[in-house]
Amino acid sequence: MDALEEESFALSFSSASDAEFDAVVGYLEDIIMDDEFQLLQRNFMDKYYQEFEDTEENKLTYTPIFNEYISLVEKYIEEQLLERIPGFNMAAFTTTLQHHKDEVAGDIFDMLLTFTDFLAFKEMFLDYRAEKEGRGLDLSSGLVVTSLCKSSSVPASQNNLRP
């Protein structure tokens, strides 16, 4: 094989593996956005969100919750992917994901990170708890209403309006 053939072979192999990776990510998006997955995750979080506190210290009770989450959600996603891609290998995909992490949409990568990164998992629960307790992100103090009409900058006495 000459250099040109090797380069062409490498390019076609790379393109095929990139296409396969992109297909898996597309399926993941579909699975994560599906109502069934949303319900599964929401029910799990409803069950445990009060256990989580926003402190530096991690309670021992978090570990079995984390392990149960991994078993439940990762198993569900893997089953869904196997239905769509016979022979799918989650371990191989996770390895490939590390090489392509900059190419994956933030929401998907963050969700996948909750399987392997305990702090991301804990943060997900803390965000959910804040939302459930009405402590979600409040942007109202940062909003300012301004008129787009030029006349609003003219004093009332000059634009024939009575106070």
Swiss-Prot record:
| Main localization category | cytoplasm
Location relative to the cell: Cytoplasm; Mitochondrion intermembrane space; Cytoplasm, Cytoskeleton, Microtubule organizing center, Centrosome; Nucleus
The protein's GO terms of the molecular function aspect are: transcription coactivator activity
Sorted keywords for this record are: Cell projection, Cilium, Cytoplasm, Cytoskeleton, Mitochondrion, Nucleus
Top-rank taxon: Eukaryota
Mitochondrion listed as a keyword: yes
A GO CC term assigned to this protein in UniProt: midbody
Pfam families reported in the protein's UniProt record: ARL2_Bind_BART (PF11527)
InterPro entries recorded: ARL2BP, BART_dom, BART_sf
Q: Does the keyword Mitochondrion apply?
A: yes
**Which cysteines in this chain are paired by disulphide bridges?**
none
Q: Which GO terms describe its biological process?
A: maintenance of protein location in nucleus; positive regulation of tyrosine phosphorylation of STAT protein
Expressed, tissue-wise, as follows: Expressed in brain.
The annotated subunit structure for this chain is: Interacts with GTP bound ARL2 and ARL3; the complex ARL2-ARL2BP as well as ARL2BP alone, binds to SLC25A4/ANT1. Interaction with ARL2 may be required for targeting to cilia basal body. Interacts with STAT3; interaction is enhanced with ARL2. Found in a complex with ARL2, ARL2BP and SLC25A4. Interacts with STAT2, STAT3 and STAT4. Found in a complex with ARL2BP, ARL2 and SLC25A6.
Write out the function statement from the record: Together with ARL2, plays a role in the nuclear translocation, retention and transcriptional activity of STAT3. May play a role as an effector of ARL2.
- Membership in a protein family: Belongs to the ARL2BP family.
Query: What is the designated name of this protein?
Result: ADP-ribosylation factor-like protein 2-binding protein
